[in-house]
């Protein structure tokens, strides 16, 4: 094991590496959680410096953080490697690389204001980064919450609860071997768009990357913008070799959708594409028999009728689109287009489980 020394306001703390975290990470966690100093100097608490929406006056960051806090933040920014910086969630991806490159090209950071000279750092994001460096949340603290445990089982990758609470619209996407379907719903559970496409030539012959790109790009071009794009995550076993062609197709589709729909990930490191557990949706709507999920066709049919007959339906279809959606549904009755039904059910479950109430 190796040690890391953190110098702050004339004092000296030492914390040792653990197998799963960097020394800088735990050193700053100890800094945040240690007992208050007995010195007369007052350290500004988090509740006062955490105003991330404040306007940017001159030397704003110096006024938000005490000299002791500034020294701790600068210590991390000037000494941590790219890997150590990525221990802080807000510094994952390109941001950590940009910090190290800026440090190598222009020397150590002299003050917090200079961090805003680094690409991808604006005033608000700089305040967020400084706060996260001072008081990072440990994995143990996150695991204590039953809410977080449930969300980790429901959605991948992990998403902050605040982002889920603030969502205004999502596009739920379900694809199979022959077709893809999507449903666009806002937080009032109004169906803004609901479509399917089965005119593709995937899984015919070789698995050509260029063909997948062309087909999926064409489909995505028809989708409106949304806060999140939610993909269905199936539980097919890799142990069954006969399912390998289907698994390969699913993984290619998933990778393409993650790459094409996560348009700002390289800049801000924020995921917009999520994968949602298929069986969790089935359990939510009581469609599971053992480990198998039954068709949601009749449930979707009932939702369509309820939207017309009930004053407060579970999901709302706009009056100018309800006829079109009913005709689309009726045209699939002989084919049993499960992707179409499942895309709508997944969207409803996302709001009811992850946005409105995170407990089943």
UniProtKB/Swiss-Prot annotation:
What residues does the transit peptide encompass? Answer: 1-35
Note the Gene3D superfamilies from the entry: Ribonuclease H-like superfamily/Ribonuclease H
One GO term of the biological process aspect = transcription elongation by mitochondrial RNA polymerase
Q: Which GO CC annotations does the UniProt entry carry?
A: mitochondrial matrix; mitochondrial nucleoid; mitochondrion; ribonucleoprotein complex
**Outcome of altering residue 157 to A?**
In COXPD58; likely pathogenic; decreased DNA polymerase processivity factor activity
Task: Cite the entry's keywords alphabetically.
Answer: Disease variant, Mitochondrion, Mitochondrion nucleoid, Primary mitochondrial disease, Transcription, Transcription regulation, Transit peptide
Q: Please provide, alphabetically and separated by semicolons, the GO molecular function terms listed in this UniProt record.
A: DNA polymerase processivity factor activity; RNA binding; transcription elongation factor activity
UniProt disease annotation: Combined oxidative phosphorylation deficiency 58: An autosomal recessive mitochondrial disease manifesting in the first 5 years of life and characterized by a wide range of clinical presentations. Clinical features include neonatal lactic acidosis, epileptic encephalopathy, developmental delay and impaired intellectual development with non-specific brain abnormalities, or mitochondrial myopathy with a treatable neuromuscular transmission defect.
| Protein function | Transcription elongation factor which increases mitochondrial RNA polymerase processivity. Regulates transcription of the mitochondrial genome, including genes important for the oxidative phosphorylation machinery.
Family in the record: Belongs to the TEFM family.
This chain belongs to the protein called Transcription elongation factor, mitochondrial
Which species is this UniProt entry from? Homo sapiens
At the highest ranks, the source species' classification is: Eukaryota, Metazoa, Chordata, Craniata, Vertebrata
């Amino acid at each position: 094991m190796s040690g890391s020394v953190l110098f702050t306001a004339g004092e000296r703390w030492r914390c040792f590496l653990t197998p799963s975290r960097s020394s800088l990470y735990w050193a700053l966690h100890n800094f945040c959680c240690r007992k208050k100093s007995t010195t007369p100097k007052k350290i500004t608490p988090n509740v006062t410096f955490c105003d991330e929406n404040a306007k940017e006056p001159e030397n704003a960051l110096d006024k938000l953080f005490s000299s002791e806090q500034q020294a701790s933040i600068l210590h991390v920014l000037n000494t941590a490697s790219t890997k150590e910086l990525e221990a802080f969630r807000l510094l994952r991806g390109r941001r950590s690389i940009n910090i190290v490159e800026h440090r190598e090209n222009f020397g150590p950071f002299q003050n917090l204001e200079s961090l805003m000279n680094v690409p991808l750092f604006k005033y608000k994001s700089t305040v967020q980064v400084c706060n996260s460096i001072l008081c990072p949340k440990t994995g143990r603290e996150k695991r204590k919450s039953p809410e977080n445990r449930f969300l980790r089982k429901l959605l991948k990758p992990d998403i902050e609860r605040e982002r889920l609470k603030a969502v205004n619209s999502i596009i739920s996407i379900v694809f199979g071997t022959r077709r893809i379907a999507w449903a666009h719903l806002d937080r009032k559970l109004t169906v803004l768009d609901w479509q399917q496409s089965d005119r593709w030539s995937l899984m015919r012959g070789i698995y050509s990357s260029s063909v997948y790109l062309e087909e999926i790009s064409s489909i995505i071009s028809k989708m409106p913008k949304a806060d999140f794009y939610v993909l269905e995550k199936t539980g097919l076993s890799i142990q069954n070799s006969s399912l390998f062609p289907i698994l390969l197709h699913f993984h290619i589709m998933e990778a393409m959708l993650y790459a094409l729909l996560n348009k700002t990930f390289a800049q801000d490191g924020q995921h917009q594409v999520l994968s949602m557990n298929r069986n969790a949706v089935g359990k939510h709507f009581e469609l599971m028999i053992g480990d198998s999920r039954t068709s949601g066709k009749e449930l979707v049919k009932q939702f369509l009728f309820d939207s017309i007959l009930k004053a407060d339906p579970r999901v709302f279809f706009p009056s100018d689109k309800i006829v079109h959606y009913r005709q689309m549904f009726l045209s699939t009755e002989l084919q049993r287009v499960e992707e179409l039904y499942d895309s709508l059910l997944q969207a409803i479950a996302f709001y009811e489980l992850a946005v409105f109430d995170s407990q089943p």
